[in-house]
Amino acid sequence: MDAGVNHLISQLFFENKHFYIFQERCALAGIDVPIAAGIMPVINKRQVQKMASLCGVNVPKKFQKILEKYEDNPIAMRDAGIAYAVDQIVDLVTHGVDGVHLYTMNNSYIARKIYKATHSLFESTHKGAKDASNSA
């Protein structure tokens, strides 16, 4: 913070409650810069296992069931991973998140699908912020 940080990006997570706890801890520590939530849409079971191991990320039972159900169907797995990420983003925006960072691993298809499903949430939030600043 002393070096001039003006925003943060969280590591990935699959349960929003962990991000909300992180936000609270940052606030208690006096960190008052915007924090973007790090969301990684999962496209295969191996990817989840690797990231969970690497980052110490908890994989909730709800998500484990999705992984098991679609592990032999790559297209369905990709679509379920995108849907799960979109649900996370909707919840985050509803709770006033400062922003979202997508860890798409350079997969433009996933980025495009998530953008199409969520851009209106950000446009209405951004428009509301612009309207509020214009009326001040």
Model-predicted segments: where are they?
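Conserved, mostly hydrophobic/aromatic
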Residues: G4, A37, V100
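Catalytic beta/alpha-barrel core
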Residues: N6-E15, H101-T104
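Electropositive phosphate-/nucleotide-binding environments in soluble metabolic enzymes
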Residues: N16, D79-V86, M105-S108
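Active-site-adjacent beta->alpha loops and helix N-cap segments on the catalytic face
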Residues: L12-A27, N107-A117
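Active-site pocket-lining/capping segments in soluble small-molecule metabolic enzymes
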Residues: E24, L28-I82, D87, T118-D131, ...
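A short pocket-lining beta-strand/turn micro-motif at the edge of beta-sheets
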Residues: I31-V33, G96-H101
